[in-house]
C-alpha cells in the first residue's frame, strides 16, 4: 500500500479531505482541520502530547519523560513532530532521518520500507521517530503526523508499545499541528514562569479545550520548566483552574545535557541531577496512573491574561 502516492499532497494538504465541508464535520463549528481516520486510532497505548512555546524545552522534557517511562518498565515510542527533526537526538545521539526523508528515498512507496528505516532505538530502549514535515512555508504538518501513524500501524509497530509521546512543534495550534491531540489521552503544556510562555500556554489550552469537545483528549496540566520560581504560573492556574503538575528548575546542567547530546538520566549523578530525575519519575508515574482528574480549565481572553500577569 502506498501511504503517499503523490508527494504534492505534502504541499497542498490542509486537511485529509479537500472538501472543506467534510473537513469541518465533527471538529467544531467553522473548523477546517485534519481529521482522524477511525482506522488510525493508536490502540491500547497511553498517548501524551507535549506542547508549549517555541524554545521552552519541549524536546528536553519529552526525551527525559520518555526515559522515565522506560525506567518504569514501559515500552516507549517518542514521535517528533517538528520539521527540524531534533526531538530525539539526546536519545539517539544523532539526527535521525525523518519519515518524509525515507518516503522520498523510495518515491513514496511505503511498502518498500522496513521498520528500521524510520524507527530508531535510543537510550534505555526508547524507540524514536521523527515525522519531519513539508518544506518551510508549505503544506500541513498534521497531514504528515497522520501519515506517520498510518505507517506505524502498517508495520504493526504500535501493538507492543505502552506509551507514545508526541513532541509537537512550537506553540502552533492550527488544525495541522493540533492533529496529535486527536490521538492523545492527555496533553501537557511546558511553560516557564514568564509572560510569553504563559500567554502561549493559555492559547494552547484553548485549542485543547476545543479538541476535547469531539475527541478523548483532555488537558493534563502545566509542566513548569527552566524556572526558579513558579509564582506567575501558579497565579495563572488559580485564575483558570489549569494546575501545575511538575516543576523543573533552571539548572545549567540541563543546558549542558543538550550540548552533550545526553538525557539527564545519563549525566553524572549529582544531587541536583538526582532531584530532577526523581521529579521526572514522579511525573511519569502520575501520568501512567491517571489518578488526577482531567483539567476542565477556563482559558482567559488575551486582554485578561495580559492584565493578570506581572508584579503588583
From Swiss-Prot:
[4Fe-4S] cluster binds at residues 140, 174. Its cofactor is [4Fe-4S] cluster. It holds the Pfam family Fer4_NifH. This is Light-independent protochlorophyllide reductase iron-sulfur ATP-binding protein. It comes from Rhodopseudomonas palustris (strain BisB18). GO terms for molecular function: 4 iron, 4 sulfur cluster binding; ATP binding; metal ion binding; oxidoreductase activity, acting on iron-sulfur proteins as donors; oxidoreductase activity, acting on the CH-CH group of donors, iron-sulfur protein as acceptor. Belongs to the NifH/BchL/ChlL family. Pathway: Porphyrin-containing compound metabolism; bacteriochlorophyll biosynthesis (light-independent). The keyword Iron-sulfur applies. One of its GO terms (biological process) is photosynthesis, dark reaction. The gene is bchL.
Amino acid at each position: 500500500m502506498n501511504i503517499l502516492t503523490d508527494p504534492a499532497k505534502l504541499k497542498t494538504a490542509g486537511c485529509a479531505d479537500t472538501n472543506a465541508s467534510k473537513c469541518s464535520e465533527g471538529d467544531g463549528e467553522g473548523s477546517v482541520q485534519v481529521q482522524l481516520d477511525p482506522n488510525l486510532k493508536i490502540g491500547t497505548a497511553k498517548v501524551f502530547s507535549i506542547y508549549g512555546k517555541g524554545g521552552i524545552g519541549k524536546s528536553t522534557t519529552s526525551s527525559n519523560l520518555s526515559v522515565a517511562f522506560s525506567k518504569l518498565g514501559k515500552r516507549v515510542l517518542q514521535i517528533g513532530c517538528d520539521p527540524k527533526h531534533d526531538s530525539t537526538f539526546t536519545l539517539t545521539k544523532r539526527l535521525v532521518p525523518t519519515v518524509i526523508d525515507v518516503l522520498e528515498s523510495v518515491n513514496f512507496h511505503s511498502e518498500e520500507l522496513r521498520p528500521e528505516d524510520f524507527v530508531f532505538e535510543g537510550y534505555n530502549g526508547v524507540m524514536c521517530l521523527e515525522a519531519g514535515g513539508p518544506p518551510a512555508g508549505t503544506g500541513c504538518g498534521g497531514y504528515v503526523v497522520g501519515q506517520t501513524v498510518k505507517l506505524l500501524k502498517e508495520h504493526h509497530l504500535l501493538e507492543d508499545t505502552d506509551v507514545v509521546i508526541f513532541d509537537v512543534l512550537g506553540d502552533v495550534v492550527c488544525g495541522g499541528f493540533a492533529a496529535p491531540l486527536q490521538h492523545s489521552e492527555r496533553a501537557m503544556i511546558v511553560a516557564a514562569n514568564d509572560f510569553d510562555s504563559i500567554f502561549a500556554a493559555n492559547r494552547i489550552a484553548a485549542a485543547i479545550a476545543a479538541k476535547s469537545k469531539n475527541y478523548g483528549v483532555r488537558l493534563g496540566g502545566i509542566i513548569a520548566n527552566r524556572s526558579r520560581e513558579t509564582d506567575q504560573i501558579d497565579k495563572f492556574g488559580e485564575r483558570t483552574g489549569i494546575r501545575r503538575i511538575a516543576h523543573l528548575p533552571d539548572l545549567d546542567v540541563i543546558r549542558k545535557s543538550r550540548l552533550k547530546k545526553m538525557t539527564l538520566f545519563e549525566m553524572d549523578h549529582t544531587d541536583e541531577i538526582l532531584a530532577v530525575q526523581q521529579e521526572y519519575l514522579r511525573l511519569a508515574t502520575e501520568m501512567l496512573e491517571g489518578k488526577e482528574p482531567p483539567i476542565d480549565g477556563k482559558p482567559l481572553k488575551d486582554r485578561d491574561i495580559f492584565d493578570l500577569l506581572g508584579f503588583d
